[in-house]
């Protein structure tokens, strides 16, 4: 079954009301909005806007960064003290609320001054619809040069050399394994002998579960979130040589997707044994990531697969939790690939209709200052796109180990959009296939599906949909082909570096 995602923004624009926008905390109108909604940010080619000294400015900022909300609010207070003519109206939405409300606000001509690209949308598409303005002339080259290698990429944050959006953080893997030292000790597992292979991991999980007697289990998972489960299985398959890449990527090997590869089936076999062994916390099938994280902190499981964001949450909410982080186990015959991740992803940009882009740029420069970024890194669970900050501010012992493991156990995967920005149009054309891989994993957790048959069907339907989308974009006059999504020089044990795109 194919779920159509095309035309979502237009549908939302027609069905969402302005009352619903206000109800979610987004003020889509104010006394200054009539002028601002139609303001032109450039009066002529190459000419920028300069806000008059003493002019009162309200910046509307909307995003979904709830994990940094406390830091952000303190930042806003300081920013307004240092810039008394500026008032910041900041709204934090869930990612679902963001999709449902901000897209509608944009279509209605009431976009916030600063906002991120909605999840699943590509830069080329939103720039074509005039959502963002290029910021180079407002922020300056010195500011842009402060970003680390791989943070600003053509087709991702930048088009034709013009930067439209900035990444929130450096992109690191989010499928390392946290281990609960208290649970392992109670089960008689030596922390210095953590499992490194699939068989070892399975045996340790069985030992922990037996020792727990219903009090704790080998592993707990976020079964209510299909995306988390898919990331987990993709990572397992990657260690077996699957070349799965990130969940958002269209990657082909020998002209085919890898969703039913031998490595993927092996990964599902391994996961299935953990469930059949009874090593999974019985509530896993219904838990969202925050709930699984909380039960792990209550010493109900030895292992949890999640990302670095857990660290600061546990430090704040569960200061007595004794935990560490380890690499994902690999097949018994050794790793044939590392955990794939892609470069920093697009986030915040300045609205094309922003009446005071120079003030918005000043906000961004302060947001990415070493002072503010250092605080986020010090909290743990955050890796800044400003390299110099990470070198001095990363002090949490578990976060340091996480960062080290990211360097050792992960490898940068190729990105078709970096290789050829026109491929973004294919992503916009593709519709989701159901059941997805994550939904199939949910079935494994519930022991309710024949995952081998489902994977075969998923791979077949995905291949048909990818080829249909490529043909549709090609028919519109854009030079794209299946070869644009294949990287024959990709060694999954190594980083795919910028120079490799030229020789693929």
What are these regions (language model features)?
Residues 1-59, 81, 468-504:
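Short, low-complexity disordered leader/linker segments with a strong preference
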Residues 44-51, 120-176, 231-232, 239, ...:
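Hinge/lid segment of periplasmic solute-binding proteins
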Residues 55-66, 86-91, 113-114, 164, ...:
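Short, well-ordered beta-strand elements
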Residues 77, 81-82, 108, 187, ...:
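Extracytoplasmic/periplasmic substrate-recognition and gating elements
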Residues 78-154, 185-188, 193-196, 295, ...:
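Extracytoplasmic "Venus flytrap"/periplasmic binding protein-like
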Residues 157-170, 175, 199-256, 272, ...:
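Extracytoplasmic/periplasmic solute-binding protein
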Residues 202-207, 249-284, 328:
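Glycine-centered hinge/linker elements that transmit conformational signals in sensory
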Residues 319, 326, 378-445, 479-504:
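Long, aromatic- and glycine/proline-rich binding clefts that accommodate carbohydrate-like moieties
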